[in-house]
Structure formats: C-alpha cells, structure tokens
Swiss-Prot record:
This is Holliday junction branch migration complex subunit RuvB. The gene is ruvB. DNA binds at residues 309, 314. It is found in: Cytoplasm. Residues 181-251 are annotated as: Small ATPAse domain (RuvB-S). It comes from Geobacter sp. (strain M21). Homohexamer. Forms an RuvA(8)-RuvB(12)-Holliday junction (HJ) complex. HJ DNA is sandwiched between 2 RuvA tetramers; dsDNA enters through RuvA and exits via RuvB. An RuvB hexamer assembles on each DNA strand where it exits the tetramer. Each RuvB hexamer is contacted by two RuvA subunits (via domain III) on 2 adjacent RuvB subunits; this complex drives branch migration. In the full resolvosome a probable DNA-RuvA(4)-RuvB(12)-RuvC(2) complex forms which resolves the HJ.
C-alpha cells in the first residue's frame, strides 16, 4: 500500500509533469539554491560553455528533478534522464554518454546507488570529458580514450553521505534543498489548483500546506485527494473546513503525521518509556524495516523536534509527549557523589 504522505514518487505523481515550472523565475522556494544556480547559468551562457556539474541533495519530493529540467531549459539544451539503479554496467553508461550532444544535461537520480565499477567510468567523463574503453582481454587488452562532448551532469540524491569522496569532489556546484515554508507550499497548492481547474479558498490552501510536511510532492498529492472529497461530499470548493474533514478521513493530523508516524512515536513513549531505544527494536515493534524508518519517517520527525537520535538510541522529545497530550518525564538529576 502506498503511503499517502510519502515523499517518494508514485504512479499518481505522473501528473506532476504538468505542474512543473520550466524557468527559474517560476520556481517557488529554495531561494539560496535558485539564486546560485541562476548566477552560474548566466555565466556559463555568457561564455558559451557547458554549466559545471551540479549535485542536488536533500529529502525526497523537494524539486530536484524539476530543477534539473529547469537547468536544461535555461541553458537551451536537451536533457537525458536516468537513475543510478538503472545503470547496471559500464556499457550502459557508455551508451548514454556517447549519445550526448555538446552542452547537454545528463540527469542521474539516486546517484548514490551507482555501482563502484560504473563510478570509475564516470570519473574521466566528468573531469576530462573522455571515456576509457578497454579493447581485448588478458595481456593483449589495451585502453583507448574516446572524446566526449562537454556536458553537464546533474546528480540528485537523498543520501549525500553515501556518495564516495572522488565522485562528490567532481561536482563544481553543490546545493542542498530544504523543506518548504507553509507560505511557499500554499502558493504552490494554489497554482496547482488553478492548473487543474479546482476551486480553493486561501485558508483551504494554507490548511493543506500545514499538513504537507514541507514537501511540494506531498502537497500536490493531498490536493488531489481533498479535491475528490470536495467533489463528492461538498460543493466542490476546497475550504479550510473541507480540507480538515478530508484530511481527518485520511487520518492525517494537524502536524501532517499519518498512522506510521504516530506508531513510531507512541511505541517509543508507551513501550520504551520515551527512550533511548534502538532502531532495530522500534522496527520489530511496529513491523517495519529499519532502513525505511531511518530514510522515510525519521527526517521529518527529527527536523521538527519530535525525535532525537542519540548514541544510545532514539528518544521522544517533550514536543512528542505534548502532541499526544502526555506529560513528559522529568530528566534524571545527576548525583553529587
């Protein structure tokens, strides 16, 4: 079952293509990253050169793919999109690289999942715009260098720490994408509603924004589900009351928590005295994979102050207790002797 407020892509998100802006001036939020990219793009265009390689990292659903497409549009070049898991062999990467034209953009999503062997092929391609090809086998094998057109690699990752240092060091532009503010999300939701021909009140857009976990992909997904509710059980207009009723039906609370978020926090609070408790123990208690908890659920809980990671395990914060109407335990007092 697909998690409604997961920031990962789903089939339902294919509609996102029609919502994506095509110019930096239309892109909402990420002002620091947007400002830097605009400067570097203008400079590269002025010199008639390819833009330096770009690494975009941050939680899923914040607009990394959109920015990659905007870079290509602003540079006036083509974009070839792929992902790390798809490029299984060096030959797969070689086929992609040799089909690029001068100044084209190659977008690799989930670039942290490239194999070490494929990375080795990518290094000279990024640095020297050359492809090392081995001809023959055994003692008679030899390497020839194939020149490549100067291109821009745009890599996207949710786990920058998993990138090898040699790969990370070859990116000239590195930008971190942050969670969006409520005002930015409300603007995005209003724009999406206009494109889809939906009627939405400002307070309805803000209510959706508050529960979208700072993520445009989640905001657009919730908008489509609330639209269905408004169409069937209301007069078609998404007001704050309609949004509140629809989200209550979907079991998404005022913080944007769903059942799994609540299960994680309540497990720590009720079963393990607020923590610290190990990740594997939490995973076993709620029947979920440890990696899924760490990569999908925890970032939002930690960034919003509901969960702490400590060397001894996960700890529920006072904000988590307050959210569920519980009284947080007093911190232990240190002994004098």
């Amino acid at each position: 079952m697909t998690r409604l407020i997961s920031a990962d892509k789903s089939e339902d998100d294919l509609l996102e293509a029609s919502l994506r802006p095509r110019a930096l001036s239309d892109y909402v939020g990420q002002e620091k990253a947007k400002g830097n990219l605009g400067l570097f793009i203008d400079a590269a265009r002025g010199r008639g050169e390819a833009l330096d390689h770009v690494l975009l990292y941050g939680p899923p659903g914040l607009g990394k793919t959109t920015l990659a497409n905007i870079i290509a549009c602003e540079m006036g070049v083509n974009i070839k999109s792929t992902s790390g898991p798809v490029i299984e062999r060096p030959g797969d990467l070689a086929a992609i690289l040799t089909n690029l034209e001068a100044h084209d953009v190659l977008f690799i999503d989930e670039i942290h999942r490239l194999s070490h062997v494929v990375e080795e092929i990518l290094y000279p391609a990024m640095e020297d715009f050359q492809l090392d090809i081995i001809i023959g086998q055994g003692p008679s094998a030899r390497t020839i260098k194939l020149d490549l057109p100067k291109f821009t690699l745009v890599g996207a990752t949710t786990r920058a720490g998993l990138l090898s240092s040699p790969l990370r060091d070859r990116f000239g532009v590195i930008s971190r994408l942050e969670f969006y503010t409520h005002d930015e999300l409300a603007f995005i939701i209003t724009r999406s509603a206009r494109i889809f021909g939906m009627a939405i009140a400002p307070e309805g857009a803000m209510e959706l924004a508050r529960r979208s976990r700072g993520t445009p992909r989640i905001a657009n997904r919730l908008l489509r589900r609330v639209r269905d509710f408004a169409q069937v059980r209301a007069d078609g207009v998404i007001t704050r009351a309609v949004a509140d009723q629809a989200l209550a039906l979907l079991e998404i609370d005022e913080m944007g928590f769903d059942m799994m978020d609540r299960a994680i926090l309540l497990t720590i609070i009720d079963k393990f005295g607020g923590g610290p408790v190990g990740l594997d123990t939490i995973a076993a208690a709620i029947s979920e994979e440890s990696d899924t908890i760490e990569d999908v659920y925890e970032p939002f809980l930690i960034q919003n102050g509901f969960l702490n990671r400590t060397p001894r395990g996960r700890v529920a914060t006072a904000a988590a207790y307050s959210h569920f109407g519980r009284i947080a335990p007093e911190p232990p007092q240190g002994k004098l002797f």
